[in-house]
């Protein structure tokens, strides 16, 4: 059984490496201990470092992704052979080799209510959808452009970057910046 949590979210990306804020109103039944968190993940998608975590309070949340770089163990080298981002299909080109970290969103029940994830609190990955696209957040340590088949082109500035990626016959990538979008978090059981 899947629960769908519609959110009204806005993101603000203030220039190169600027702070990214995702706010939302959650509808649906969510236990009081539920937190929404952003994690830097390994190249295989495993959570490595919790970057931000907030409780859902009164059906609302506000995630402010820090401007700081993820830890070195959360970073991987970005090159044409290891890009496994949404919408990327071979052939892939990367304008410069750089370090990167992808941010994925998870929920967990903060059973001891200490405000952070602990062993024994299972993480549940959630996909953040905006319209027909998916919210994709990635950090790079230098400016780089990634190109792939079907029109994929992402120009990344040093720091955190956020995009809406729509995959169809072509791949459409648009910056996730000032404004509002409808976002849905799908929580699998």
Where would I find each of the regions flagged by the language model?
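Short Pro-Gly-centered beta-turn/loop motif in secreted/extracellular proteins
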Residues: 64-77, 139-141
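Acidic, glycine-anchored loop motifs typical of Ca2+
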Residues: 110-122
